[in-house]
Amino acid sequence: MRISSVLRLVSLALMLAIAGCASKPSRINNVCAVFEQNSSWMNNWKRDVRQASSRHGIPPHVMMATIRMESGFDSKARPRGKKFLGIFPGKKLSTAYGYSQALDGTWLQYQRETGRHSARRTSFSDAADFVGWYHAKSVRTLGLAPHDTYNLYLAYYSGHGGYARGNWRSNRTIQAYARKTADMANSYAGQMQSCW
């Protein structure tokens, strides 16, 4: 009798864990659809973004646009590496990983400064909090406005030191990414009026 009770509990725990796993949303240009596709009791992205926004003072549409640009809402996203002889995986170019594409060192700094030592880059809740934390640091250290998606994204991509040095000024590609992220944030802000 005890073994069957244990098996039932294990089965229930596995079902809850699987139900809580997020799959990549299919309609990533519509933030309301993204929230709708991830709105279970255990995995509620709207709740996660709302909490991170409240904690760090960064608007939710800015955080969602950043995550959209960085990973396309793919929990296991990684930058593409170079290929050796065109087919074999080569050297990794970056340690960026997960929803937020946070680098190893920056993620460790986040864990130390926030006390969230068990935070994972593949957890949407943790990634949303990371993006809010990083943007809030940009607001404090670089004097950026919390709604200035363009410059917040430049600082996110370049790092605080790179942004302060102006490394992005000669990089048209990163400027285009920042413009695209700002446009996405504006679109998300409009969409959120009907689902926030």
Residue ranges and their predicted role:
Residues A22-W196:
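Catalytic glycan-binding domains that act on GlcNAc-containing polysaccharides
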Residues A17-G20:
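C-terminal motif of bacterial Sec signal peptides marking the signal peptidase cleavage site
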Residues M1-V10:
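Bacterial N-terminal signal peptides that target proteins for export
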